Amino acid sequence: MDKKSNQVERPVVFFDISIGDVPVGRMKMELFSDIVPRTAENFRQLCTGEYKRNGVPQGYKNCLFHRVIKDFMVQGGDFIKGDGTGAMCIYGGDRFADENFIEKHTGAGLLSMANSGPNSNGCQFFITCDACDFLDGKHVVFGRLVDGLLTLRKIENVATGPNNRPKLPVKITECGQM
C-alpha cells in the first residue's frame, strides 16, 4: 500500500472536531483515490463543499458524529437528518454502488462507508477504532487517518446514551482539503 501511496498523489482532507463547545483537535485523512476513485471523490467533495444542490453547498461542515461505540468505530456524515437515516451522494440520487472491497478493516483509523446493505453508500461513513474484519466485504474502506489518532480516541471515549448516541454533540466544525 505504501508503494502505491508514493506513486499516486492521494487527496488529504481534514476534520476539525469539537465535543460540546470545546475544540478537541484535527483529523487528517488520506483518501484511496487510486483504489476506490468514486467513493474517495464522493467523500472529498462532501469535505470541501464543492458539490451543490440548488446552489447550496452540501457536506460535512457542522455535521455530527451520531454513533460512537468504544473499541469499534465512530460514525457520522448524516448531514441530511442527523440521526443515521439520511443519505445523499454526489452522483445524483441518494446512494451509489459498492466500488470494491480491496482494502480491509485491519486496524484503527480506517475510513469506511456506512450503509444499509449492499450498494447503499451515501454520505455516511465511519472511522474504525480497532480491527473489525467482520466488516470486510460489506463496507468499502476508502481512506485512512494520517494524523489525529488522539482526536479519534477523544471521540471514541465520549459518554453515550440510547442507540450509542453521544451525550455531548461531537461536531465537525470545519472540513476541507489540505
Curated annotation (Swiss-Prot):
One of the record's GO cellular component terms: cytoplasm
BP GO terms, sorted: protein folding
Species annotation: Rhizopus delemar (strain RA 99-880 / ATCC MYA-4621 / FGSC 9543 / NRRL 43880) (Mucormycosis agent)
Enzyme class, spelled out: isomerase
Protein name (database record): Peptidyl-prolyl cis-trans isomerase H
EC code: 5.2.1.8
SUPFAM superfamilies documented for this protein: Cyclophilin-like (SSF50891)
Domain (PPIase cyclophilin-type): residue spans on this chain: 14-177
Any Pfam family: Pro_isomerase
One GO MF term attached to the UniProt entry: peptidyl-prolyl cis-trans isomerase activity
Keywords: Isomerase, Nucleus, Rotamase
Disulfide linkage: none
Subcellular location(s) per record: Nucleus
Its biological purpose: PPIases accelerate the folding of proteins. It catalyzes the cis-trans isomerization of proline imidic peptide bonds in oligopeptides.
Protein family per UniProt: Belongs to the cyclophilin-type PPIase family. PPIase H subfamily.
Reaction(s) the record says it catalyses: [protein]-peptidylproline (omega=180) = [protein]-peptidylproline (omega=0)
